[in-house]
A protein has these predicted regions:
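Conserved serine/cysteine hydrolase catalytic core
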Residues: 153-204
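Active-site loop/oxyanion-hole signature of alpha/beta-hydrolase fold enzymes
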Residues: 20-24, 33-67, 232
């Protein structure tokens, strides 16, 4: 069944415009939207949390195929678990159902808040350079589009995103994965061992309606390291 609409949800420090190469390469006949998530781009002044944002997204776009990368995947998963009637298909790329153990989640929350203070101290430009220099983004080219989209963010917006929507703020959704009934595609880059393990486990818990795919030659940022390959994966899945 062809979805009525496709919604693409970006990762931390990005914005909806980062999806342009993927959108141009997709062959689906459905209209495609790529909104800015809270704290990013045109939504830099928004400080909505994960739950409220997922409710707003479901209301805004209605029944759609949802494609989420990293942070965007956590938003997409919230939409799917809270509003399953709004999700015809679900693609989760390089993402997680949350941090399960309370002490680990508390430690991550503290680290996220410390990082938020650092962002406010150093400013958006230096922080984005630091962020994208992490080994997990080694395969990501700093294209003019990538630089332009990230430059539309603000230090306060990114800091507030961590404080309201960071992984440390999210309640784990692992126990809800078996309740998902829509077709689900879980994707991770072959060089991203951590999210390969997480993705494989997520797909196993979802069940027979889920497929786990490893993107060869890619790291964490699969859609932006290999936009054509990712677009082909998603387009084939939505047919």
């Amino acid at each position: 069944m062809i979805p009525r609409r496709v919604v693409l949800l970006h990762g931390f420090t990005q914005g909806g415009g980062i999806w342009i190469p993927v959108m141009e390469a997709m062959t689906t006949r459905a209209p495609v939207d790529a909104p800015d998530l809270p704290g990013h781009g045109s939504a830099s002044s928004q400080t909505t949390n994960l739950i409220d944002t997922s409710d707003e997204l479901a209301l805004r776009f209605g029944n759609s195929a949802w494609v989420g990368y990293s942070m965007g995947g956590r938003f997409a998963l919230h939409v799917a678990t809270r509003h399953p009637d709004a999700v015809s298909h679900l693609v989760l790329c390089s993402t997680t159902a949350g941090i399960e153990h309370d002490d680990e989640r508390a430690a991550r929350r503290a680290a996220d808040h410390q990082l938020a203070r650092h962002i406010r101290d150093v400013g958006v430009g230096p922080f984005i350079s630091e962020w994208t220099s992490q080994p997990m983004f080694a395969g990501l080219k700093r294209t003019p589009l990538d630089l332009e989209v990230r430059a539309e963010n603000t230090a306060e917006g990114l800091a507030s995103s961590l404080e309201t929507c960071g992984a440390g703020e999210q309640s784990p959704l692992w126990e809800l994965l078996p309740t998902l009934r829509m077709p689900v595609l879980v994707v991770a880059g072959a060089r991203d061992e951590k999210f390969c393990r997480i993705g494989e486990r997520m797909a196993a818990l979802i069940g027979s309606n889920a497929e786990f795919v490893v993107a060869e030659g890619a790291g964490h940022a699969v859609p932006f390291e290999r936009p054509q390959a990712f677009a082909d994966l998603v387009s084939d899945f939505l047919r």
